[in-house]
């Protein structure tokens, strides 16, 4: 048993820290097995812990104080992140489900939980994009990049990388720029690996993107403003969370002023552009009718785009380019 105190003690006997207690309770619940499941729940639990400690959270460090209202507040926080474009619906629902599972492991009952994560978030998981992504106009994006460069050059590099390569925010921040530049120059394609999400194949799954002039330019700019002694956009002594707070958040506000909801929109714009390159038809969300004309080609494009975006399922492409119509 991982219990370190009385069952009715702090964090139900699993220690003084909320961040430690959750994973310990999960290990007990799964009997020391199901490593991948425990790891996934534990990672999502840490996101809940960070929110609890944040200015927006309840400021607690004891699972005994977590009640249904706190979970409802957390659901509202996640819903806000989804609305802002910072989090996918699936990720938000997974986080709520993992908090439910971890609370059950800590408490030993199902009394404190979010009854329906999808209802709590007020949205359906199977999302299909119905509005064209912002940031498809490259000239508009480059004007934003120039504006960002005046105050936050590294945020400008992130925006340019996201639009050129379809990288996620974390991937753009942690990308090994020297390696990518070498691959671009020698192979004509780059393999996005750093900062990727886990999933079934993890960060080792090949994710090659064909290089064009836009990618070459984005990599040159990012490498140029990369901090001294760093191989990515983080300074050697800089924490990722500090970078998000001090650089990304102000940059996101500027994106909003230029009618772009977030960096994720630039990723979707990349996907729509790739669909048009592959099929010679506009993306469905832009009014394209490739599916009606050539279903096989539409399917091939969706699979290719899904892989380039770092997903393993073809249906995920609909969240970026629209459904089959």
Show where each model-derived region lies.
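DNA breakage-rejoining catalytic core of tyrosine-based enzymes
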Residues: 124-143, 199-214, 227-231
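Basic, Lys/Arg- and aromatic-enriched nucleic-acid-binding interface segment
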Residues: 139-169, 296-299
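A short, glycine-centered helix-capping/turn motif at helix boundaries
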Residues: 152, 161-175, 273, 277-282, ...
